[in-house]
Amino acid sequence: MDAIKKKMQAMKVDRENAQDLAEQMEQKLKDTETAKAKLEEDFNDLQKKLTTTENNFDVANEQLQEANTKLENSDKQITQLESDVGALQRRLQLLEEDFERSEEKLATTTEKLEEASKAADESERNRKVLEGRSNTAEERIDVLEKQLETAKNVATDADQKFDEAARKLAITEVDLERAETRLEAADAKVHELEEELTVVGANIKTLQVQNDQASQREDSYEETIRDLSKNLKDAETRATEAERQLTKLQKEVDRLEDELLAEKERYKAISDELDQTFAEIAGY
């Protein structure tokens, strides 16, 4: 009888221990399931971050391609502007050469005009001298008449020369006006070209600034891509580690569930044995 009581007490202790162990196992299982849920949540967050990182990488890559396209367009514009500047400089040189030729022609025309004016003045002085002599010497009328006729002829020639000089002067004045007009047009064109060169220079400086900014943005994009690539690699590493931890926890959960099932079976066996013992005691 004492042996039965001891056995019952031992079985009772085993049952209590088994019950405590089962409760501990259930609590451990709950904790494990909580950790598993937390890991699954972290894993989902990592997947979301990974997706966001991939999207940011794609956006940065597109921005980098756009920056490269803009940089190529800027280089083409700079090349075209440099070509335009060269053409404008050649045109300016041609205009300067035309202006120099106009000045030379104007100087030549002015010199010829001065010579014609001197010849006309000389003829006029000769005519006046002849007229004075005809008034003071009547005995020399015949001679003077001849001289006068000669003087008239000279005067006529002088008038013709004067008319020719006047005509040439008029032509020269027209040429001078045309030269002045061309000079003014050349000055205006030079001023216009200088303004165009100023604008082109400003545009070139602007394009150079844009080119520098594009280079800076390109460096920034490359750095961003490197950072995103590193973040992507880190996220992939964390995701792999999370999957490994999740697999490990799943195995631990399976093991604990197996142990819990074994403890429940053991507890059931102890309970059945106690029930059988109580039945045997009741039979006595």
From Swiss-Prot:
Disulfide bonds: none
Coiled-coil ranges per UniProt: 1-284
Start and end residues of each stretch annotated as Disordered: 103-133
Keyword Protein transport: no
N-terminal signal peptide: none
UniProt keyword annotations, A-Z: Coiled coil, Repeat
Keyword Coiled coil included in the entry's annotation: yes
A Pfam family this chain is assigned to: Tropomyosin
SUPFAM superfamilies hit by this protein: Tropomyosin (SSF57997)
InterPro entries: Tropomyosin
Highest taxon in the source lineage: Eukaryota
Described function: Tropomyosin, in association with the troponin complex, plays a central role in the calcium dependent regulation of muscle contraction.
Known partners and oligomeric status: Homodimer.
Domain statement: The molecule is in a coiled coil structure that is formed by 2 polypeptide chains. The sequence exhibits a prominent seven-residues periodicity.
Family: Belongs to the tropomyosin family.
Protein name: Tropomyosin
Organism listed in the record: Chlamys nipponensis akazara
Organism lineage string: Eukaryota, Metazoa, Spiralia, Lophotrochozoa, Mollusca
